[in-house]
């Protein structure tokens, strides 16, 4: 009976998740830590602009990785494409000494809402797809 009650208390839903992180982040940090962090923060501002534009919600981040929930798959894909275009343009600028490239994975699946965070297979699949990108 206790297990059944615990299951009912879990807040589940279907969500569209975008996972992204920096390619070769550890190597960038090893080579030039301060410049890498500076560039990562600038790229994060670009990402936040597109998250807002496409009605997304950043629910988890750590180091160079970001997890975002979207109301639709179309919004997630449009956000990813716009972000990659802006990052590519930024990386081709003469001012950038440490260009950062981002991998992105998008999935739709069941998640568990825990406070403001999302957990579960839907998040894990997005992270696995991102790692394959």
State where each predicted segment sits:
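Catalytic beta-strand-to-alpha-helix segment of the class III nucleotidyl cyclase homology domain
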Residues: 8, 45, 67-133
């Amino acid at each position: 009976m206790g297990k059944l009650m615990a299951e009912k208390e879990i807040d589940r839903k279907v969500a569209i998740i975008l996972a992204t992180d920096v390619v070769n982040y550890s190597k960038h940090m090893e080579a030039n830590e301060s410049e890498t962090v500076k560039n990562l923060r600038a790229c994060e501002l670009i990402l936040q602009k597109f998250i807002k534009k496409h009605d997304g919600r950043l629910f988890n981040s750590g180091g160079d990785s970001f997890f975002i929930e979207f109301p639709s798959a179309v919004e997630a894909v449009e956000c990813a494409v716009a972000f990659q275009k802006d990052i590519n343009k930024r990386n081709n600028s003469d001012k950038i000494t440490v260009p950062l490239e981002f991998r992105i994975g998008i999935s739709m699946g069941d998640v568990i809402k825990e406070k403001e965070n999302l957990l579960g297979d839907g998040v894990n699949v997005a992270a696995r797809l991102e790692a394959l990108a």
